[in-house]
Curated annotation (Swiss-Prot):
<dbReference type="InterPro" id="IPR023173">
    <property type="entry name" value="NADPH_Cyt_P450_Rdtase_alpha"/>
</dbReference>
<feature type="binding site">
    <location>
        <position position="657"/>
    </location>
    <ligand>
        <name>NADP(+)</name>
    </ligand>
</feature>
<dbReference type="GO" id="GO:0030586">
    <property type="term" value="F:[methionine synthase] reductase (NADPH) activity"/>
</dbReference>
<feature type="binding site">
    <location>
        <position position="289"/>
    </location>
    <ligand>
        <name>NADP(+)</name>
    </ligand>
</feature>
<dbReference type="GO" id="GO:0050667">
    <property type="term" value="P:homocysteine metabolic process"/>
</dbReference>
<feature type="binding site">
    <location>
        <position position="695"/>
    </location>
    <ligand>
        <name>FAD</name>
    </ligand>
</feature>
<feature type="binding site">
    <location>
        <begin position="93"/>
        <end position="124"/>
    </location>
    <ligand>
        <name>FMN</name>
    </ligand>
</feature>
<keyword id="KW-0597">Phosphoprotein</keyword>
<protein>
    <recommendedName>
        <fullName>Methionine synthase reductase</fullName>
        <ecNumber>1.16.1.8</ecNumber>
    </recommendedName>
</protein>
<comment type="subunit">
    <text>Forms a multiprotein complex with MMACHC, MMADHC and MTR.</text>
</comment>
<keyword id="KW-0285">Flavoprotein</keyword>
<dbReference type="InterPro" id="IPR039261">
    <property type="entry name" value="FNR_nucleotide-bd"/>
</dbReference>
<keyword id="KW-0028">Amino-acid biosynthesis</keyword>
<dbReference type="GO" id="GO:0050660">
    <property type="term" value="F:flavin adenine dinucleotide binding"/>
</dbReference>
<dbReference type="InterPro" id="IPR017938">
    <property type="entry name" value="Riboflavin_synthase-like_b-brl"/>
</dbReference>
<dbReference type="GO" id="GO:0009086">
    <property type="term" value="P:methionine biosynthetic process"/>
</dbReference>
<feature type="binding site">
    <location>
        <begin position="622"/>
        <end position="624"/>
    </location>
    <ligand>
        <name>NADP(+)</name>
    </ligand>
</feature>
Length: 695
């Protein structure tokens, strides 16, 4: 069987899952995938590799390769490597990203570019899958086209002309081969082909006269929804993926009294269990978003940080949602039983392994509370598996539609874009009764949530501040449910007893109540830090909660200036924005203090919802408007004074708008075309003078 090397670089498991899918399908087409995480450098050697290489690479942070790929990227970026170092290598790469972020798929692009520079050649076009619109829109056709590309590679390299049988098996894949980065989402949905992991043609479900006779007259009265389809989908024969092979055996055993630790859900970083020493509401009660500041007491730990760092908060799922699942799965009376997980002896899943995020011994309630991301949007493979555990034929048909090729648009609209989760599906399809093992196979790890440090350890020794908006939204899949963010909702509830209301932050000790504790862990180092040279000018752009790291910056600068009264400190610009001056102007008093004492030299604040009277050119509604108004100064700081620009906050709109504003400013002030201005900004990023902390 023809071997290829298959490497994945993953941050949250997405790239790994896709690589495993490729590995499972490979056998069908006469290939053998040698599957490894890119961090397992002792198990492969690109310098001597003769087989083709297939890579699946995700993107994290500000367009960075995932943590698992850091050593790999560092190794291939070694400037001493000759330009023909990998000239023998042939590869295909699938990049995963989110176009809401400025540096889309940059993790894959960085590796792709460097492989090219070292002489490696593509045997298959690079794919760029966009999580903003649905990874599957590129992932599925990219995988389908991979087999024909591999076949062509082996034929051309080894001169095999006796592979007609294998070519026949690969022919249906070649018909669907596309250039993924050119795939137009809206017009190319029909290109998707869902093949099963066993390699047979996708199963076709014929809906006969029973379906059409009983439903057609009624269905026209409905609009399409999560639970109902309309023609032509409701009358179509469906191409659905075959059932993913089950591979986990789960037994619930009587508990023996062992204690569980939150640390068991974190496998890499050290975990610190620290008390909350203060909690303050930073916004008025009538503000559109409620923002809280939390102070942690880290004085009895060796946790250290510097302004600009971020850290993880280990959070649980909502207790009410966990209890719903226990009741719905008919396991409420066994919530304290211990979960024992093993690999099924007869599983067909290649490389089946126990999920690392499931502790060896934990209770069922602990598992659902601390280990599984029960809010995750179900992938199509999960829907396919759920369909086989759904008793009602109409409900089963609808789940099959949602995971089918024909139902791709419905899946995007009613599952993906609606943010439907397992609880929503179980409410929508009452006859669906999945076994616990299925949840462990398909639900990802509950990830810790990252937050920016909003303080300086020089200014607040032994303390760590962070701020957040309490996320609230309506789940409107089948019934309207008000939900809070997994972590922000939990934190808000946790600090209720000690929360200081708006404008009462000066009462340092807060309410006399038992201080709650939370578990935190450090995040890998980043470059979102103040310049080493304090004389270098900086521009900070942080609307809303994005101001958090800059409070730490300014606190740090204030202490440095106190320690070095004769020192030279560069100009500091802060572009802050909020909706209303009187409702959500975060840290107003602190910013005025920094301005008064000279730590902050320029403060520009924009209010997007306030109506200003008497301003000739109208108020600056957003931070990008304020940047444009100070175009010459901004360009001077960046291009003449070798300054830094920091952007923190919303990736979906703000970061893009600020990026575009900076391009326009550079173009206008230097008299160059926008393409050249974009190159200049890219150079600033490479020099780590244009830094982003966006989410």
């Amino acid at each position: 069987m023809r071997r290829f090397l298959l490497l994945y670089a993953t941050q949250r498991g997405q790239a790994k899952a896709i690589a495993e899918e490729i590995s499972e399908k490979a056998v069908t087409y006469g290939f053998s995938a040698d599957l490894h995480c890119i961090s397992e450098s002792d198990k492969y050697d690109l310098k001597t590799e003769t087989a083709p290489l297939v890579m699946v690479v995700s993107t994290t942070g500000n367009g960075d390769p995932p943590d698992t790929a850091r050593k790999f990227v560092k190794a291939i970026k070694d400037k001493t490597l000759p330009p023909d170092f990998l000239a023998h290598l042939r590869y295909g790469l699938l990049g995963l990203g989110d176009s809401e972020y400025t540096y889309f798929c940059n993790g894959g692009k960085v590796i792709d570019k460097r492989l090219q520079e070292l002489g490696a050649q593509r045997f298959y076009d690079t794919g760029h899958a966009d999580d903003c619109v649905g990874l599957e829109l590129v992932v599925e056709p990219w995988i389908n086209g991979l087999w024909a590309a591999l076949e062509k590679h082996f034929l051309s390299n080894r001169g095999r002309e006796d592979t007609s049988e294998t070519l026949t098996m690969a022919s249906h894949a070649s018909r669907d081969a596309v250039t993924p980065e050119l795939l137009h989402v809206e017009s190319q949905v029909g290109l998707l082909k869902l093949d099963d992991s066993g390699g047979k043609a996708a199963k076709v479900l014929e809906q006969n006269a029973v379906n059409s006779n009983q439903s057609s007259t009624l269905i026209v009265d409905f609009e399409a929804s999560l639970t109902h389809s309309v023609p032509p989908l409701s009358q179509a024969s469906l191409n659905i993926p075959s059932l993913p092979p089950e591979y986990l055996e789960v037994h619930l055993e009587e508990a023996l009294g062992q204690e569980e630790s939150h640390a068991s859900v974190s496998l890499v970083d050290p975990v610190f269990h620290v008390p909350v020493s203060k909690a303050v509401q930073l916004t008025t009660n009538d503000a559109i978003k409620t923002t809280l500041l939390i102070e942690l007491d880290i004085s009895k730990t060796d946790f250290s940080y510097q302004p600009g760092d971020a850290f993880n908060v280990i959070c649980p799922n909502s207790d009410s949602e966990v209890q719903f699942l226990l009741q719905r799965l008919q396991l409420a009376d066994r919530r304290e039983h211990h979960v024992a997980v093993t690999i099924k002896a007869d599983t067909r899943k290649k490389g089946a392994a126990l999920p690392q995020h499931v502790p060896e011994r934990c209770s069922l309630q602990f598992l659902l509370t601390w280990c599984l991301e029960i809010r995750a949007v179900p992938k199509k493979a999960f829907l396919r598996a759920l369909a086989d555990h759904t008793g009602d034929s109409a409900e089963r048909r609808r789940l099959q539609e949602l995971c089918s090729r024909q139902g791709a648009a419905d899946y995007t609209r009613f599952v993906r874009e609606a943010g439907a989760c397992l609880s929503d599906l179980l409410r929508a399809f009452p006859s669906c009764q999945p076994p616990l093992g299925l949840l462990l196979e398909h639900l990802p790890k509950l990830q810790p949530r990252p937050y920016s440090c909003a303080s300086s350890s020089l200014f607040h020794p032994g303390k760590l501040h962070f701020i957040f908006n309490i996320v609230e939204f309506l789940s409107n899949t089948t019934e309207v449910i008000l939900r809070r963010g997994v972590c922000t909702g939990w934190l808000a509830t946790l600090v209720e007893s000690i929360l200081q209301p708006y404008m009462c932050a000066n009462h340092v000790d807060g309410k006399k109540a038992l201080a709650p504790k939370i578990s935190i862990s450090p995040r890998t180092t980043n470059s979102f830090h103040l310049p080493d040279d304090p004389s270098v000018p900086i521009i900070m752009v942080g609307p809303g909660a994005g101001v958090a790291p800059f409070i730490g910056f300014l606190q740090h600068r204030e202490k440095l200036q106190e320690q070095h009264p004769g020192g030279h400190f560069g100009a500091t610009w802060l572009f802050f924005g909020c909706r209303h001056k009187e409702r959500d102007y975060l840290f107003r008093d602190e910013l005025r203090h920094f301005l008064k004492c000279g730590v902050l030299t320029h403060l520009e604040v924009s209010f997007s919802r306030d109506v200003a009277v008497g301003e000739e050119e109208g108020p600056a509604k957003y931070v990008q408007d304020s940047l444009q108004r100070h175009s010459k100064q901004v360009a001077g700081v960046l291009l003449q004074d070798s300054g830094y620009v920091y952007v923190c906050g919303d990736a979906k709109n703000m970061a893009k708008d600020v990026h575009d504003a900076l391009v326009e400013i550079i173009s206008r002030e230097t008299g160059v075309e926008k393409l050249e201005a974009m190159k200049t900004l890219a150079t600033l990023k490479e020099e780590k003078r244009y830094l982003q902390d966006i989410w």
